[in-house]
């Protein structure tokens, strides 16, 4: 039934009842009926507007034609993304704690991995396919006190490309944990100096990547996960 039909029926009912009602009692009844009719019409009109403009009614799921629905569970989305990229080359190697005095990378430790063609040869990661890669590495230095000569710590990631076979630094950082010498007789306080580097690069199949430092004797192996090197295909 439309809103106009409802209003017309209410008006007809008012005319019939107003003819039958008489005197003060009839006027009072007519007034109550008019108020009730007004509220009924107002309510019906409001309900019609809400239904017409879709303010109330069944909920419709918003979906994007080029992507997952907005109410899709996050876990399911992450799982699908992980499955879609499971065939991409990836590697995460950690420092070999059994090789003191030098930075040697290993892939047989906990939390280390190599997958989908990445190889570790001669302390270098070998790229299996052309593409964009995220390259990252972190080292942590530790020492006690500061020497009389300046102490500089460097961390460098280099690339040897198959196309020109020349070692080129693609990421490099330098830090100095000591700003002045520890006075003679003073307590040698410990210091820590982390260096993290990362960037995205276009690599070719067969490229070799290395992560090196200049002061391996200051490396801190006290905790696992402090010194690592890795690549992820994007």
From Swiss-Prot:
The keyword Membrane applies. The modification Phosphoserine is found at residue 2. GO terms for cellular component: cell surface; extracellular space; plasma membrane. The soluble form derives from the membrane form by proteolytic processing. The membrane-bound form is further proteolytically processed by SPPL2A or SPPL2B through regulated intramembrane proteolysis producing TNF intracellular domains (ICD1 and ICD2) released in the cytosol and TNF C-domain 1 and C-domain 2 secreted into the extracellular space. GO terms for molecular function: cytokine activity; tumor necrosis factor receptor binding. It is a single-pass type II membrane protein. Keywords: Cell membrane, Cytokine, Disulfide bond, Glycoprotein, Lipoprotein, Membrane, Myristate, Phosphoprotein, Secreted, Signal-anchor, Transmembrane, Transmembrane helix. The keyword Glycoprotein applies. GO terms for biological process: extrinsic apoptotic signaling pathway via death domain receptors; immune response; necroptotic signaling pathway; negative regulation of protein-containing complex disassembly; positive regulation of apoptotic process; positive regulation of canonical NF-kappaB signal transduction; positive regulation of extrinsic apoptotic signaling pathway; positive regulation of JUN kinase activity. A lipid is attached at residues 19-20 (N6-myristoyl lysine). Residues 57-233 are extracellular. The record marks 34-35, 39-40, 49-52, 78-79 as: Cleavage. Homotrimer. Interacts with SPPL2B. Cytokine that binds to TNFRSF1A/TNFR1 and TNFRSF1B/TNFBR. It is mainly secreted by macrophages and can induce cell death of certain tumor cell lines. It is potent pyrogen causing fever by direct action or by stimulation of interleukin-1 secretion and is implicated in the induction of cachexia, Under certain conditions it can stimulate cell proliferation and induce cell differentiation. Induces insulin resistance in adipocytes via inhibition of insulin-induced IRS1 tyrosine phosphorylation and insulin-induced glucose uptake. Belongs to the tumor necrosis factor family. This is Tumor necrosis factor. It comes from Capra hircus (Goat).
């Amino acid at each position: 039934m439309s809103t106009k039909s409802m209003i017309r029926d209410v008006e007809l009912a008012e005319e019939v009842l107003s003819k039958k009602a008489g005197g003060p009692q009839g006027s009072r009844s007519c007034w109550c009926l008019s108020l009730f009719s007004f509220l009924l019409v107002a309510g019906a009109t409001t309900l019609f507007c809400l239904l017409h403009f879709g303010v109330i009614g069944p909920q419709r799921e918003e979906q994007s034609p080029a992507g997952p629905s907005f109410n899709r569970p996050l876990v399911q989305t992450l799982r699908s993304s992980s499955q879609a990229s499971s065939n991409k080359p990836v590697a995460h190697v950690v420092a070999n704690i059994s090789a003191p005095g030098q930075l040697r990378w290993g892939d047989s430790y906990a939390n280390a991995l190599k997958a989908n063609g990445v190889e570790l040869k001669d302390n270098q990661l070998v790229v299996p396919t052309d593409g964009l890669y995220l390259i990252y590495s972190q080292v942590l230095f530790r020492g006690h006190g500061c020497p009389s000569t300046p102490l500089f710590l460097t961390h460098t990631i280099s690339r040897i490309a198959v196309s020109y076979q020349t070692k080129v630094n693609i990421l490099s950082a330098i830090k100095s944990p000591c700003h002045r010498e520890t006075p003679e007789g003073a307590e040698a306080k410990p210091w820590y100096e982390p260096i993290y580097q990362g960037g995205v690069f276009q690599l070719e199949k067969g490229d070799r990547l290395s992560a090196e430092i200049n002061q391996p004797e200051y490396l801190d192996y006290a905790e696992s996960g402090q010194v690592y090197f890795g690549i992820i295909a994007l």
